Swiss-Prot record:
It comes from the Bacteria. The keyword Hydrolase applies. HAMAP family: DapE. GO terms for molecular function: acetylornithine deacetylase activity; cobalt ion binding; succinyl-diaminopimelate desuccinylase activity; zinc ion binding. The keyword Metal-binding applies. Its cofactor is Zn(2+); Co(2+). This is Succinyl-diaminopimelate desuccinylase. It catalyses: N-succinyl-(2S,6S)-2,6-diaminopimelate + H2O = (2S,6S)-2,6-diaminopimelate + succinate. Zn(2+) 2 binds at D103, E138, H352. Homodimer. Zn(2+) 1 binds at H70, D103, E166.
Amino acid sequence: MSATLALTEQLIARASVTPDDQHCQQLMTERLAALGFECETIASHGVTNLWAVKRGADGRDGKLLAFAGHTDVVPTGPLEQWTSPPFVPTHRDGKLYGRGAADMKTSLAAFVVASEEFVAAHPGHRGAIAFLITSDEEGPATDGTVKVVELLETRGERVDYCIVGEPTSSAELGDVVKNGRRGSMSGELVVKGVQGHIAYPHLAKNPIHLLAPALAELAAEQWDAGNEYFPPTTWQVSNLHAGTGATNVIPGHADLMFNFRFSTASTVEGLQARVHAILGKHGLEYTLKWSVSGLPFLTPRGDLSNALENAIRAETGLTTELSTTGGTSDGRFIARICPQVIEFGPPNGSIHKIDEHIDVRFVDPLKNVYRRVLEQLIA
């Protein structure tokens, strides 16, 4: 069994359902400390974070390449629906099954072993390697990567390149990498009316009727046209509620929850202003609470994307696609301190599902791609 596969199995065997790390980071720290990494545990409200750095011959003047990832996994769902226990690494038909196999314990193991091989082959490497690992990516993400980034900001730590080990591939390892992500902003809208008997509408004020024209306009609005890297911004309703459940009562308020997934073609302030303008045009009496969970980020073509594309091509023969599709990731926090952030990991077809798995034939090639990137950028 390869070193990468063995470490992957050890990590899967630890039931690290968010935010419980279950000592996964301790296992990684033992391996990294043996290589000369300075390892720091940063705990926050039940979340475990790791910042580990190995400086190169150039010291703090050298380029720093960080790997960012998470040890936490989503809950298993009904255990009886799993073909094998989710925290017992199991091989069937050339695949390794277990919660976290694809998202993202294979990536964690692959970069640890890639670092071991790189340091052994290049003991005098010039640049620095770092690991930024959290147990709060699958949860609220309020005490994980964002806390470490804030700490690094206060220290003036410079990160030149960052690979996030999210499962970005589609059908084959390396066919897709993410060089950016859309931002995410949610709104909680309460439209006020006047409750009353449904037979006497002149004595009441129906907030559903008041909201409907504005809702139609918001749904039809083209917020932007996107750009060469991002599709157009989208606005979607996630929840709509009004009424008491009775059939003879006009409700006193209507509650709407919605979400923007927005590109670099729009801003938080611009989108908020346009929503308020539409609501105001319809004369609504309302309250609106905003929540921004992430800003869009984009890494243009540069040293990191070139190195990753070259490594994937050398290892797999594939020409990778740079993409910004999908949901948010911790890359949105890291982009605050790092100009080049790219996500790359194994295929994502089974993530968060019953019987999550990874094709074993991708495990060592993933490690090799990571090692090739290290060799190109910081050797």
